[in-house]
Amino acid sequence: MSLLKSIPKVDKFIMNEAFEGLSRTLITKIAKKTLEELRNDILNNKIEKIDENTLINEVLDSYKDLTSPSLKSLINATGIIVHTNLGRSLLDEKSLTKAIKIATTYNNLEYDLKKGKRGERYEHITKSLQALTSCEDAIVVNNNASAVFLILNTFCKNKEVIVSRGELVEIGGSFRVPEVMNQSGAKLKEIGTTNKTHLRDYENAICEKTSMLMKVHKSNYSIEGFSSEVSFEVIVKIAQQNNLIDYFDMGSGHIIDLPYNLNKDEPSILDIMKYKPSLLSFSGDKLFGSVQAGIIIGKKELIAKIKKNQLLRMLRVDKITLALLEETLNSYLKNELDSIPTLKMLNTKIETLEQRANNLKEKCENFIKCEVIKTSTMVGGGTTPNKKIPTIALTLEHKNYKPNKLEEILRKNSIISRIENDKVLLDFRTILESDCKKIEEILKNLFESTK
């Protein structure tokens, strides 16, 4: 009981000079919680004495943890360009500057400057998407999963959607196409087998309950060997013959030809649009190289129906997303592809990567063992699962640390690396030019005195 009486009073405790200049409201909340935990520890015989300095430090640590940004800038040295866990596609600084201007001023998000009345937010990207893809109309929601859900809910509620069994995919975060269909109200009708789906499977499955023929791009895995599938071009023709909607969930979408024969595994938006599809959707922040968004393009009358769905308001994008997406679209239209970081990384020549790696090696080899090697990496983001692309990496070895420990040390200092052949690798496919100096300084601070 005497120990309980020794617990500091909150009002007196928060007056300590260590808390000067800090938010009194937040310090009070943290102090109350800390002192309550102390009381419980005393009652459970976990504490024998009270150290007020320890309590003060606990409160200060909690305050710092709460008020420090959780999202932190990192150096991606994994080589994975569209790294799902590290924020997917990077954005161009110039685009961000323009978006900041939009965010910090009033703007015409939903205001028609010509007519002087309410406008539509999607008009800011529609013309650009029409010019870029030759679509009739377009709309954007907050990600491609939302796009899939919205399309199915708009056109297929209580109706059948025909999908090949081999395309009922699961992507990151346990996002499963069949479950999304169920949540949308659509009724899944599986056809074919895991490895083979034929034209006759589609034709035999169509009935009066059918609303849509859907194709899902197998972005994060592939079926090889004894297998076959029906092309989307053929699916479009079948749908048109039966007065049905055809829809292609492309997952990751891209506009330009990709290096290293990546087009073989990733269909081009422009190629698909040649078939004049009813609808297709794709992610904005994968190979398209923009902000997170679900981009839907297709027939004007179908997009108009999507716009009338009440769910659209729940899934709509904000002014920042639209401003950033508009900048990316302008980069495509102007053929300024170097201003799209994802494409720039993909297209950087191996000689350039090698030069950067050698430059860093020369500056760091005095305090850590390193070697420039040729290796390979992957695009990431659930795209091109079987394709590896050439890259250059700097291997790191230290006599005091095993690879796992060295990787951990780097990670705690904002460098995310990978381990290959029992060595830590810094992959220059994703290391920005501006990162090189930062890496040099970090390695020097960590290892100069321990080599």
Curated annotation (Swiss-Prot):
Pathway(s): Aminoacyl-tRNA biosynthesis; selenocysteinyl-tRNA(Sec) biosynthesis; selenocysteinyl-tRNA(Sec) from L-seryl-tRNA(Sec) (bacterial route): step 1/1
Ranges annotated as spanning the membrane: none
This protein's GO CC annotations: cytoplasm
Any Pfam family hit: SelA
Entry's Gene Ontology molecular function annotations: L-seryl-tRNA(Sec) selenium transferase activity
Keyword Cytoplasm assigned: yes
Keyword Cytoplasm in record: yes
Superkingdom of the organism of origin: Bacteria
Cofactor(s) recorded in Swiss-Prot or TrEMBL: pyridoxal 5'-phosphate
Catalytic reaction list: L-seryl-tRNA(Sec) + selenophosphate + H(+) = L-selenocysteinyl-tRNA(Sec) + phosphate
Modified residue annotations for N6-(pyridoxal phosphate)lysine: 286
Places the protein is found: Cytoplasm
EC annotation from Swiss-Prot or TrEMBL: 2.9.1.1
HAMAP family with a match to the protein in the record: SelA (MF_00423)
Functional summary from the UniProt entry: Converts seryl-tRNA(Sec) to selenocysteinyl-tRNA(Sec) required for selenoprotein biosynthesis.
PANTHER family recorded: L-SERYL-TRNA(SEC) SELENIUM TRANSFERASE (PTHR32328:SF0)
Assigned protein family: Belongs to the SelA family.
Name of this protein: L-seryl-tRNA(Sec) selenium transferase
Source organism of the structure: Aliarcobacter butzleri (strain RM4018) (Arcobacter butzleri)
